[in-house]
């Protein structure tokens, strides 16, 4: 027992080391270099995913995953119950909000193009392993539910065309399953099971086959859309948009409808999951995301216009609005034409949910966060066939046992969370130093920030030589660059915000003068009034930045500015969550104009604006990409606000189910993923490799130059780790080493350290290379 209590002695348990090890594991990031230029696309089984997708294929995937449910279901639902003919405005507002998240996805797709896994991979590269697993796990949930819901919706469509004979037969012959669905007549949906299995087989047969099937259905859906537009023009009536009829529920109904219409645009992230299978992802991904959102908006608005002009908004059928609007005018043949389009659109939406799900599973399994057998890629179909079969089976099981109403309620929370994290990642990456983009979470460490503060990222390259850490230097960290001498932090021009590129450009017309940037004669195109305005407000702006403690407006961010942005984004997320919660759950106090409620709202708005302003004043990373999200930091910040608001609008039962799913994911991650991660295995191999040379480490008190002696029988064993140590030796403490006249070389610079160790091994006749 004494040994047990001794092991629990806080002096013996290295709590700090244990916390640091866990902290470093959950925040470790995946190097971007491993996914660039096709690197890392080969699986453990030696098979690559086929790179066969064109820009048109990606647009077809994005449109198909969105337009089915949005055009045939959401338009009628929002028009009747929320916004009336104002559903048109609701779709436009939702489209703007979706485009904000879409441009962030597009930048990430360009930054890390050769990837599968979408937001999961992006988070793994930027935020860290734990957050990436959390996002990927919830993306699996959304695609799983979306597939099951699509199969159930198709089953309901066929049942409706058959006058509900299928559902009655199943309820009478098979029986009901009370408790699995909200309705008392919930029955095992065998037709939905069959549909899910068929689509799973199509996806598993190969990406080219599934994309071809998807394109055919999209063409069919397009033909039906054209038919609706032309046929509907003969039945429109402008009186349904008369005064007071366009916005029957006011702007509150329009905004409520916009929150629902936003879900009709969810699905464009499927484009980002196929980066590894695209022929030219750098240009295809941003173009396909933007084009698919614009096409979906056009389809939704045009259909909503025809729908609300053909029938009064309060008579719209919510289950099949486009079919019933022709029936109301006696055009029964059109019902079956629209039914064909509905089946095609819902099938494409089902395919859009099932297609990315195995690819997210494949990406996570390839990284070791899920079981690695799920990353197997078939050499025949060049698809992650095991992940396809497993995910399709789970989706079919859900479609069989759970009602459509219950499935729809769980569809959006994980996707909205993924959108929010992508916006956060864009904000963080654009303000991090170039050399630390792969692992910017290190900025959370104060010690790392102190080491890096004041050193520009590009000065870690060969053109620049930072002052050695071992040299005694009382001033701040500086650099010497052979190509370009950067101005000091005390330079007024840099603090005011002028670019050092223009200042040190030898081709500048006024190069060599005292002030190259203000020569009116040298640059006649520059406005004289703008120059005078800069001279007038420049000193005041400089003084304001100094008093506010803002950094110099340099072209290159530093570790300190990156750390500032990280903290600001974290606070921004928390404040937005509190703000949206109060707007939603405290709306009664705001509508009553309670002074404290209004004061609280104004205070939070000011705090959010201040954080955005602080982020705006930090220097951005100068790295140019083929596509970059515009108007930073406003676009990602507003996307975060919209996504958080929509997440909080979801029901309580959805959050409870979400919590249960997350708990299962945490068990998998901490029980398996964290210990079998590819990064964990690499770290173990690196530690094992370093231990091979540990005996000859020049940092050791027992250096190769001095040699070492073993303890004799007469000598005390205390200094060698105790009497139980029979073989080998343990390193003595540094204080003992110094007492014996040995000095550690840790005070030396890293470059000198490397040269000494190479020289020691080179001069030795023995071979110390690992076997």
UniProtKB/Swiss-Prot annotation:
It is linked to Retinitis pigmentosa 68: A retinal dystrophy belonging to the group of pigmentary retinopathies. Retinitis pigmentosa is characterized by retinal pigment deposits visible on fundus examination and primary loss of rod photoreceptor cells followed by secondary loss of cone photoreceptors. Patients typically have night vision blindness and loss of midperipheral visual field. As their condition progresses, they lose their far peripheral visual field and eventually central vision as well. GO terms for cellular component: cytosol; intracellular membrane-bounded organelle; lysosomal membrane; nucleoplasm; plasma membrane. Residues 736-771 are annotated as: Disordered. The modification Phosphoserine is found at residues 465, 468, 488, 757, 769. It comes from the Eukaryota. This is Solute carrier family 7 member 14. One of its GO terms (biological process) is gamma-aminobutyric acid import. It catalyses: 4-aminobutanoate(in) = 4-aminobutanoate(out). Glycans are attached at residues 282, 676. Keywords: Amino-acid transport, Glycoprotein, Lysosome, Membrane, Phosphoprotein, Retinitis pigmentosa, Transmembrane, Transmembrane helix, Transport. One of its GO terms (molecular function) is gamma-aminobutyric acid transmembrane transporter activity.
